[in-house]
């Protein structure tokens, strides 16, 4: 006999006993339902008081929290030593479990970050849309709303400061043109020490920390010292850096009253699905950064002001956990009251080592600032909504064209690329809800021995790829299974794929079509004639975007493979030089041309290449 577990609010004795077990210390609490699913994860400075507040009679809960309380059957807790530890643990657990009733920040690729790879001796600085958390020392700034402004800023920064320009050196034994024109300090040849280079990068980091004014003051002092020491060339170089930074400062979009207070202003706009949150970073009256976040929360369309404050609190906690103390402002202006404002304020004050204030503005100037941030959030929400509407329209149209039972949530596109059979490859690209999902893209090397230089077979190649893709179809999760696959080609390619899918007994589960290039004709399995469609229909345009992306991805991989083969082709003619040693030589010299110019002694220095083979290689080229 299975005893049904009642919600804890219907068993007052069990509830009271459980509450007594919870200590009055900092920590994290987890609410679970009868299926042992985590409903909500929260934190508190005083665990017992916080958890008890959910069950207090007369407590004015929001609709979301009221729904949650009705489902709670168990409460767990984890004690921490400090509030800061509770904050960090809560963030990690929410990210791991994604509880339904928590505010969830989407790991969105719409907004880019700027990354500084402090984990490397000579850090790189680049723009990325993916926060890689594998290396703890690396630092990410963002996510930035204005991608163009970020790119322009980085471009100007690289003109002002001599920085590493390439992920890998272009030459082994000499510096490239960037060094000759002063754009790079000669990192590849170690013409600058890691310590000296770090000093340059630390100054660049100050720009993205919103400390450009502070950096200009430092450079002014340094310029005066160099001038006093009669180092006029260095002084002139620093002067040019200051001019560049001043022009960067002048390009800021919004100027506010020129006080010396550092402040952040945060506001949001939401619909029934998502909330767009914008955070303006203002330093010395200048808007130095505009960050964007996407949040999800149940019943957002009917959210009250209290719920809006919950979203703002979640964003601020997530953001300030990953920034350095110098980036924390002394003022944080918020659109709505935060539910745990004191908790966040105390933690930020402790982290910064200086008092931090969080408040809803009452005076006209700061209230207008929040209104401006809110309007920007509304514009961004409208932009995303229009994009979503266009994609939904395209998926709806495509479902009607192909007579699909549901909208195609996941669509996969396949293409083949080769030159007369040589270096034959295939690509798979994936669109989810009408947008590219690049984390699911795949390359395939064609393994069919019949496909080789001078002997191409697109039908067999496509059949091979589809067979490999769906080899373990039954073991795949629902989210990995496509609603529709599109083959780049005509009736021939489609027939080859259909034969494979019938053999694998999946043709009834996965819809497949092909899209021919010349007339943008859509072919269905078993049909000799293409569908009658208009090339300008939204659904057809979606298939075209998918086809073009699959083609681009396949061609780029084919070119890479062909380039690698051409590099190795001359080395293949040298007796005794196998693939492994070819890789060692190319890894050491980076190109066949440099191998050709190397002396016997230089060739012999390569691991696995002795004096005898080095002489053979030298003799071959000479």
From Swiss-Prot:
Job of this protein: The UvrABC repair system catalyzes the recognition and processing of DNA lesions. UvrC both incises the 5' and 3' sides of the lesion. The N-terminal half is responsible for the 3' incision and the C-terminal half is responsible for the 5' incision.
Pfam families recorded: GIY-YIG (PF01541), HHH_2 (PF12826), UVR (PF02151), UvrC_RNaseH (PF22920), UvrC_RNaseH_dom (PF08459)
PROSITE patterns per record: GIY_YIG, UVR, UVRC
A GO CC term assigned to this protein in UniProt: cytoplasm
Subunit (UniProt): Interacts with UvrB in an incision complex.
Keyword Secreted carried by entry: no
Main location as per UniProt: cytoplasm
Organism annotation: Trichodesmium erythraeum (strain IMS101)
Family membership: Belongs to the UvrC family.
InterPro entries: DisA/LigA_HHH, GIY-YIG_endonuc, GIY-YIG_endonuc_sf, GIY-YIG_UvrC_Cho, Hlx-hairpin-Hlx_DNA-bd_motif, RuvA_2-like, UVR_dom, UVR_dom_sf
Protein's UniProt name: UvrABC system protein C
Segments forming domain UVR: 213-248
Compartment(s) where it occurs, according to its Swiss-Prot or TrEMBL record: Cytoplasm
GO terms assigned for molecular function: DNA binding; excinuclease ABC activity
PANTHER family in the cross-refs: UVRABC SYSTEM PROTEIN C, UVRC/OXIDOREDUCTASE
Encoding gene per record: uvrC
